[in-house]
Each structure stands twice: as C-alpha cells, then as structure tokens.
Amino acid sequence: MHRFVTEEKISGVGEEILLGKEESAHASKVLRLRPGEPVQLIDGENRYDAVLTDVSAEGTRARVTALCPSPEATAQAVLWQGLPKADKLELIAQKATELGAWEIWPVEMLRSVARLGKNDSKKQERLSRIALEAAKQSGRAHVPEVRGAVSFEKALKRLEEEPFDLILVAWEEEHALPLSKAVEKYRQSHDELKRVLIVIGPEGGIDEAEQQRLATLGPRILRTETAGLCALAALWTAMGEM
C-alpha cells in the first residue's frame, strides 16, 4: 500500500487531509492513483489507513478511516554516527530508519576520513530525503530527523541541552559489555528507559581520547561491544521490542 507523509497532525478517523504539494504530485503524476484507492498516512506520531477522495497535482485529499497499531518502539533511540567514508552515510541513514532510529546525528570524529565541508547542508537535505523514503517504505509512523553534521565538541555540547536516560558507546576494546547486558544493568535500577543515545564511531572506531571525554558524562555511559547498525537491532531485542 502506498504511504504519504502529511504536513499536519491528524486528529482522528473521519478527518479529510490535504497532502502537501510534493506528495500530491507524487500521487497523481508518478503513481497515477485515483479517488477511492486505499492509502496510508503518516503524521510523525501515528500511521492511519485512509482512502483517496481527490487526486490532483494541485492538492490530493484523503479521508482517514482507521488508526493503525503503532509500529514505533517505546523508547526513542538516537544514533550518533561518526562520519564514514564517501556515500556510506546514505546507506546508514536508510538502514537506521528501517531499524527504528528516532534521530540521526552525523558527527566528525578524530578517525573520520570524511570531514565537515561547505556542501553539508545539501548532504543533509539528501539524507533527510532518504530517511523520509525509508520511513514510508518500512511503515514507520515517525520520520527520523537527520541533524546537520557537527564536530565532536558541538555534539558533546548538544548532550548538555538534550538529556538521555542512557548512552551506549560502541567500543571494540576490552571491558565492554554485551549490549543486552548494558540495558539489563540500567533497568535493574530504573523503572523507565525513554531516550537512548547510541554512539557509533567511523570506520576506524572511537579514539581513546574521545572515549575519555564521553566518560565524563557520568554513570549513564555504558561501553558495549556491539558496533554499527547491529546496535539498534540489539537494543530492541534487549528491550523486548522485536
């Protein structure tokens, strides 16, 4: 079934929704849909069944017929991704969205081959588009925000402004816990786990100096042996979400 992202929040069943210009054009000119065809609508919080009532490039409309069961996990998992080589970040944005990431933070780290540059805003737009399409294809109710790429220092500053219950750092050296054990350890002393940050380094991994800086954030930091996008899947498994 075709899915469309709405520009407004949906209040409930029976409401008629006007799609934005881009989605309207996609429905009419690319997919060539017709009134009466079933679709699904995503408003950033929920996913709804709907039926098209009017199809045109100027404004496609759909009437909401049912609220779908939420496909989203109970916790929000934010992916801090050390800048990888070339276009690898595009694949990461796609797969992270499919695996349920809430946000994606590209971060320049000491071992990053790719560096911040003047075309970063265009890259962000491209990554946001990839996340949008991946969310639609995978049936997400939420489209992850892809933040603009920042330096390691600015990412640390962001953590001061945006608190997390738990920060999991993928660490390939010794003394790292299996991710499932890290989550279990946290839940032994906390009732809820609402917001998690998963820190993944670039291809060369996370530098020791960066590990030490992250460690200063306190006891909510746990080093895990799970690296890459496997960390997202492992998190949901540990929380009983898969």
Q: Residue ranges of each PLM-predicted region?
A:
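N-terminal positively charged helical leader segments and presequences
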Residues: 1-69
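Fold-independent oxyanion-binding glycine-rich loops
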Residues: 7-8, 21-22, 44, 83, ...
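Short, glycine- and charge-enriched coil/turn segments that flank and shape catalytic ligand pockets
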Residues: 9-16, 54-59, 67, 71, ...
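A generic structural signal for short beta-strands and their flanking turns/coil linkers
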Residues: 13-15, 35-37, 46-48, 58-60, ...
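Short glycine/serine/threonine-biased micro-segments
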Residues: 30, 34, 137, 199-203, ...
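RNA substrate-binding interface of SAM-dependent RNA methyltransferases
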Residues: 69-168
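Active-site/ligand-binding-proximal alpha/beta "capping" segment
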Residues: 162, 167-211, 215-220
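Structured adenosyl-cofactor binding patch, chiefly the S-adenosyl-L-methionine
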Residues: 204-242
